[in-house]
A protein has these predicted regions:
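N-terminal, positively charged regions that mediate nucleic acid binding
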Residues: 150
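Cofactor-binding loops of NAD(P)H-dependent oxidoreductases
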Residues: 24, 145-147
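Conserved G1/Walker A P-loop phosphate-binding module
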Residues: 1-60, 64-76, 80, 157-161, ...
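A short, charged, Gly/Pro-tolerant segment at domain boundaries
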Residues: 173-175
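Conserved C-terminal guanine-recognition region of P-loop GTPase G domains, centered on the G4
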Residues: 36-43, 64-144, 154, 158-171
Length: 175
């Protein structure tokens, strides 16, 4: 996601990781890792990657360093701010993120992913519905959460857990 999309707030809500969280861009300067437990005995590692900016594939905003970390992941969550105060329109934000990934390395866009609308507790209904409709139209997996209030968080964790298990099973059958 872009800076201030709620990435650090989400990792703090779903794991024991305690990244610095503040209301200004680029609070996260290095990736934060957190172990997420779900179910009785299952878990997966999440990475809070510093925010992408337009031109990241050209090195803007430390883009190369951040994009290399994304390359190591097996499943992506595109976090999109749908709050009243979001600086970007949500569909434009998502499309810019996908463009940056494709421009850095086309194979990144073939990774399984889901779109996550964030900041539901202070949402703009118009922005939320625009992103939801876009995802429905393109058949992209879509979730909406508030990490601050935990609305939708448990459902998202279960969904990601199932996706990670599916990726792991695919890797096991290929070896």
């Amino acid at each position: 996601g872009f800076p201030n999309a709620g990435k650090s707030t989400l990792i703090a809500a779903i794991s024991a990781a305690r990244p610095k969280i503040a209301d200004y861009p680029f609070t996260t300067l290095v990736p934060n890792l957190g172990m997420v437990r779900w179910g009785e005995d299952r878990g997966f590692v999440v990475a809070d990657i510093p925010g992408l900016v337009t031109g990241a594939h050209e090195g803007k905003g430390l883009g190369f360093q951040f994009l290399r970390h994304i390359d190591r992941t097996s499943f992506l969550l595109h976090l999109v701010d749908v709050s009243l105060w979001a600086t970007e329109e949500p569909v434009s934000s998502f499309e810019t993120m996908r463009h940056e990934l494709a421009s850095f390395d086309e194979s990144m866009t073939s990774k399984p992913f889901a779109v996550v609308a964030t900041k539901l507790d202070i949402r703009s209904e118009e922005r939320l519905e625009a992103l939801r409709a876009y995802c429905r139209r393109h058949q992209f997996p879509f979730h909406a959460i508030s990490a601050a209030t935990r609305e939708g968080v448990d459902e998202l964790v279960a969904y990601v857990g199932r996706q990670v298990e599916s990726v792991r099973q695919g890797c096991a059958t290929q070896s």
